[in-house]
Design a protein with these regions (language model features):
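Phosphate-binding and adjacent anionic-ligand microenvironments
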Residues: 270-427, 432-458
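Proline/glycine-rich low-complexity loops and linkers
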Residues: 84, 127-156, 160, 248-321, ...
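Short glycine-rich phosphate-binding loop at a beta-alpha junction
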Residues: 43-51, 75, 169-171, 273-279, ...
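Gly/Ser/Thr-enriched, mixed-charge loops and adjacent short helices
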Residues: 110-228
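N-terminal small/polar loop signature for handling phosphorylated ligands or for N-terminal nucleophile
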Residues: 40, 45-109, 156-157, 185-246
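Glycine-rich phosphate-binding loop
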Residues: 95-103, 107, 225-247, 252, ...
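An N-terminal, well-structured beta->alpha segment
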Residues: 1-65, 69-70, 147-168
Length: 458
């Protein structure tokens, strides 16, 4: 059996260092397995897009070769954001697609995000692709390769469905990611005046890393908002499926608070709708959703897992703290930073002060994500012990759907094992600074009690 590198097969995608763990040969074998799986399910074609990374053309070519070797048609849609690749599966009627993308990883990484027959591959399904490729359980044929351009159709679809009440002047930071290939044209068509930052696609990311979840990557947006008369700032990650938002006065509106705004808007048209959010989101979200006539549903972290839950429940909207937002109301249910940006501006354009709806959202003191680094396998063991033995005096609820989230009358603490790296992800929120410090102290004591000697990062 010809083994593939185990470390590239992650929980929600396939990702590795180009030329080391992720080579053209490896990607071709994965493509052959994906084409075989698609054909087995009666799918005849797979759309292939790629982000702006320098390794993209070679790896996309290898993937297409593999897909065709299974007798499946490969439709090359070129250099486009990941959500445009997802859109292609609908627009071209093929129901299957692969985005060759390293997302927000460093420039020497690349990877694959995959949908087969309308289902995003994750967890066991990704491991089954690995096993299939290794044991040679493959179909053989000579599928054809053809080109298609769906960028124009994607822009038209959004412009025909989203209406701004007035023109807005915005700062747009694409971080030299592939969003720059579509976003400036899209938002200009929506009626925005754009102050562009790093909208040239450059896979070496020469200005800053394209990850708007990190405050340091929004510094240029904050500075430009201060120096110009732009009303709002938006930023995209490396492959365009996540959104960052900054107000005129430089306040970062994190994705769980963005979701509040989106939920209120969607629930005005879908009363009683279920709104899905992951365990890392603010405790203020559930009462906000109920207040606006919706039903809150907390779920596991992971874009593929949230997408699957959205599909299962037919919920109109879902979101993650990481910045993935999924609209099923008026859209297709996949995570799309560009579309989320359009919907955001649609809401904000109704106000004379574009930032006012964001500034009025409830907020409370919280920490960013904190990472407790451990050896491979240890995070899951620590969380298992914490669930069984951890003491949290004064807690009102213990939520165990994804790690351990402990609710208090005045805040919450979360510890969950990352599915992508060997760390325990920690996050805390409370009504005030004193409560925040107390809850962190509870978690520090509980963690060191079940795992003596561990270095807690707070």
């Amino acid at each position: 059996m010809n083994q593939l590198p185990a470390e590239i097969f992650k929980a929600y995608d396939i990702r590795g260092i180009v030329g080391k763990s992720l080579t053209a040969g490896v990607v071709r074998r994965i493509g052959h397995a994906l084409g075989s799986l698609a054909a087995e399910q009666g799918q005849t074609a797979i759309a292939v897009g790629r982000d702006g990374r320098l390794s993209g053309p070679e790896l996309a070519g290898a993937l297409i070769d593999g897909i065709c070797a299974a007798g499946c048609e490969a439709i090359d849609i070129g250099c486009v954001p990941t959500p445009v690749t997802y859109f292609a599966a609908f627009e071209l009627g093929c129901a299957s697609c692969v985005s060759v993308t390293g997302s927000h990883n460093p420039p020497d990484y690349n990877g694959l995000k995959t949908v087969i027959g309308g289902t995003t591959l994750a967890l066991d399904a990704i491991q089954q692709i690995k096993a299939r490729a290794e044991r040679g359980d493959l179909r053989h044929g000579s599928g054809r390769r053809r080109d298609a351009d769906v960028k124009g159709a994607y822009i038209e679809r959004i412009v025909s469905g989203v209406r701004l009440a007035r023109p807005l002047k915005i700062v747009m930071d694409c971080g030299n990611g592939v969003a720059g290939a579509v976003a400036p044209e899209l938002f200009a068509r929506l009626g925005c005046e754009i102050v562009p930052l790093f909208c040239e696609v450059d896979g070496s990311f020469p200005n800053h890393h394209p990850d708007p979840s990190k405050p340091e990557n929004l510094a240029d947006v904050i500075r430009t908002l201060r120096e110009t008369d732009a009303e709002i700032g938006i930023a995209f990650d490396g492959d365009g499926d996540r959104l960052g938002v900054v107000t005129k006065d430089g306040e970062i509106i994190y994705p769980d608070r963005q979701l509040m705004l989106f939920a209120a808007d969607v629930l005005a048209r879908v009363p009683g709708g279920q709104i899905i959010y992951d365990v890392k989101c603010t405790r203020l979200l559930a009462p906000w959703i109920r207040q606006h006539g919706g039903v809150p549903l907390m779920w596991n972290t992971g874009h593929a897992l949230v997408k699957a839950k959205l599909k299962e429940t037919c919920a109109p909207l879902a979101g993650e703290m990481s910045g993935h937002t999924f609209f099923r109301e008026r859209w297709y249910g996949f995570d799309d930073g560009l579309y989320a940006g359009a919907r955001l501006l649609e809401i904000l354009s109704r106000s004379a002060d574009a930032g006012a709806p964001l500034k009025s959202l409830p907020d409370s003191p919280s920490t960013p994500e904190l990472n407790l680094k451990m050896a491979e396998g240890e995070p899951f063991a620590l969380i298992a012990r914490l669930k069984g033995e951890g003491r949290f005096d004064g807690a009102t609820e213990r939520i165990t759907i994804d790690g351990l989230r402990v609710e208090y009358p005045d805040g919450f603490g979360l510890a969950r094992p990352s599915n992508t790296t060997p760390v325990v992800v920690l996050r805390f929120e409370a009504d005030n600074g004193a409560a925040l410090a107390r809850i962190q102290g509870d978690f520090r004591r509980a963690i060191t009690a079940v795992w003596p000697g561990v270095e807690v990062p707070f």
